[in-house]
Swiss-Prot record:
Keywords: ATP-binding, Cell inner membrane, Cell membrane, Membrane, Nucleotide-binding, Translocase, Transport
Protein name, entry field: Thiamine import ATP-binding protein ThiQ
Annotated source species: Cereibacter sphaeroides (strain ATCC 17023 / DSM 158 / JCM 6121 / CCUG 31486 / LMG 2827 / NBRC 12203 / NCIMB 8253 / ATH 2.4.1.)
Highest taxon in the source lineage: Bacteria
Subunit structure: The complex is composed of two ATP-binding proteins (ThiQ), two transmembrane proteins (ThiP) and a solute-binding protein (ThiB).
Gene3D superfamilies from the UniProt entry: P-loop containing nucleotide triphosphate hydrolases
């Protein structure tokens, strides 16, 4: 279980409060206006921002003393963070060994991960040769190799067209179900939230609200969400 316990995050004049729980294996959408703090929330969970107050707990353990690399978290950004001068195999290998000291078993795992996301045979290709959808699949494969139980998605598929984005969300859902990962996904698109998540966190007006059932939240949106969605 991931628990945000009376969390307060400060960045200059901006503050964000959160008190929420995500069950192990749950998929949760995070939605709200631009600048509301959605990415800030994910960065705090990943360990890149220290909360001013409160705790972030995973399975009852306080993650506060742990740096980003020590947390059981993988974070995917919109730009995918693939190194253009490295092959896909090397980019994925960084998820296993930052020094790229890869044994035969590691190389086999990389090949399996590429096959799982539909990129079999492209291990020697560099990111510049790939489409946006293929780059998203490669970044997802790297997260899969890290095998962390918490997966944070900061709009990694926002630049894709509707069909490719739906395909990627379906793939993430499949992998999360297979691995039991807890997934928090930032999105601006209500349809993505409906398609992907049973519950949704609304981030607005300096608060990350407790997760609500997605269908019910959009059927009867609170004022902040109604203002965001528009008429």
């Amino acid at each position: 279980m991931l628990h945000l316990d009376r969390l307060l995050i400060r960045q200059g004049d901006f503050t964000l409060r959160a008190d929420a729980t995500a069950c192990a294996g749950e998929r949760i959408a995070v939605i709200g206006p631009s600048g509301g703090g959605k990415s800030t929330l994910l960065m705090a969970i990943a360990g890149f921002l220290a909360p001013a107050e409160g705790r972030i707990l995973w399975q009852g353990r306080d993650l506060g003393p742990l740096g980003p690399g020590e947390r059981q978290v993988s974070l995917l950004f919109q730009d995918q963070n693939l190194f253009p001068h490295l092959t896909l195999r090397e980019n994925l290998g960084l998820g296993i060994s930052p020094a790229l000291r890869l044994a035969a078993g590691d190389r086999a795992r990389i090949a399996e991960a590429l096959e799982r996301v539909g990129l079999a045979g492209l291990g020697e290709a560099k990111p510049g040769r790939l489409s946006g959808g293929q780059q998203g699949r490669a970044a997802l494969a790297r997260a899969l190799l890290r095998a962390r139980p918490i997966l944070l998605l900061d709009e990694p598929f926002a630049a894709l067209g509707p069909a490719l984005k739906a395909e990627m969300l379906a793939l993430v859902s499949e992998i999360a179900a297979e691995t039991g990962a807890t997934v928090l996904m930032v999105t601006h698109d209500p349809e993505d939230a409906r398609r992907f998540a049973h519950r949704t966190i609304l981030v607005a007006d300096g608060r990350a609200e407790a997760p609500q059932p997605t269908a019910a939240l959009f059927a009867d949106p609170p004022p902040a969400l109604r203002a965001y969605l528009g008429p």
